[in-house]
Amino acid sequence: MQRIALSDKLELSRIVYGMWRIGDDADTSPAHVQAKIEACLAQGITTMDQADIYGGYTAEAILGGGLKAAPGLRDKIEIVTKCGIVAPAGRHSSARVKHYDTTAGHINVSVEASLRDMGTDHVDLLLIHRPDPLIDAEETGKALDALVASGKVKAVGVSNFRPWDFSLLQSAMSNRLVTNQIEMSLLATDTFTNGDLAYLQEKRVSPMAWSPLGGGSLFSGAYGGTMAALQRIGKEQGVDATAVAIAWLLRHPAKIVPVLGTNNLERIRTAADALRVTMDRQTWFELYTLAIGKEVA
C-alpha cells in the first residue's frame, strides 16, 4: 500500500478505513474489532478514521476495546478523530439542541475523552468536524496549537470546511492545517468545480474524501449507467467496481485520500485494489460524464 505524507510529522496509508459505522456491526466485541483492524493491515490500510460523535459517542470506545485486547496494535496504526459537533446523546445527553462548539474548553475536553475512550496517549490527526458559525478563530487556533505542543495531537486539520473557513482558521495558527476531509465521490462531484479542490491544491494540502462510494448508494441499482461502466473497466483490469470508483478519486492530482465507510470486509479488500488500476484521462472523464449526467461543455 502506498503512503502519503500530510506533513513532515504525519504519513497516512493511501486509503483510510472509516469507523463511523463500526457500532452498527452485530458484533462489536474487542476480538471482532481487532480482526477488522488486522484485515485492514493485511491490505496495507494503517489509518483509522474516527470522530467523537460517531455511534452516539460510542465508536471511539469500541475501537479502544479492540486496541486494549491487542497490545502493540496501536503502534501499527494512525488514528484520525474529530470534534466540534455536540448532539443530545451519550456524554452530551443534556444538550438541548444539536450544535457546534469550537471553543478551547470544548476542544480540550473532547480530546481528553477521545484519548480515554480509545486508550491511547495521543491521536495522530485531529480535525474540527464542521465549520462553526460562532467560531473565534484566534481561540480555536491557539487551542489546536497547544494540543500539538503538548504531544496529545501530532497534526491538525478540518472537515467540511469551505476555502474561506479554512483560510480564516489557518490565519490564526502557527501549525499548518494538513487536510480538509470533504465529501467526494461519483455521486458528489461539486468539489471538482466549486473551488474546494483548486484551493487545496494551491495550498498544497491533500484532502481526505468521506463517503467515496456515496455511502453505498452507488451500488443501490439507481445508477445503472455508472455501475455498468465501473464494472466494464474493472473487468478489463481484473478488479472489482469498488476499486475503480476509488481509483477515480486517486487519479485526481490533488492527491485525494479516500476514507472507506463500510463494515463489509470484502469491500475493504477489493477497495485496496484501486492502487492497481490504471486510469487515463478519457476513462476519468467517461465516469465524470456519467456522474454529472451530461457531456462537459
From Swiss-Prot:
GO molecular function: oxidoreductase activity
Keyword NADP: yes
EC code: 1.1.1.432
Residues bound to D-glucose: 54, 98, 129-130
Active-site positions on this chain: 54 (proton donor)
Induction: Induced during growth on sulfoquinovose.
Coiled coil, from the record: none
Catalytic activity: D-glucose + NADP(+) = 6-dehydro-D-glucose + NADPH + H(+)
GO cellular component: cytosol
InterPro entries, per database record: AKR, AKR_Detox_Biosynth, Aldo/ket_reductase_CS, NADP_OxRdtase_dom, NADP_OxRdtase_dom_sf
Top-rank EC class of the record's enzyme: oxidoreductase
Binding site for NADP(+): 20-21, 49, 159-160, 181, 211, 213, 215, 261-263, 267
Pfam families: Aldo_ket_red (PF00248)
Keywords recorded for this protein, A-Z: Carbohydrate metabolism, NADP, Oxidoreductase
Purpose of the protein: Part of the sulfoquinovose monooxygenase (sulfo-SMO) pathway, a D-sulfoquinovose degradation pathway that enables the complete utilization of all carbons within sulfoquinovose (SQ) with concomitant production of inorganic sulfite. Catalyzes the NADP-dependent reduction of 6-dehydro-D-glucose to D-glucose. Cannot use NADH.
Family to which the UniProt record says this protein belongs: Belongs to the aldo/keto reductase family.
Quaternary context: Homotrimer.
Protein name: 6-dehydroglucose reductase
Organism: Agrobacterium fabrum (strain C58 / ATCC 33970) (Agrobacterium tumefaciens (strain C58))
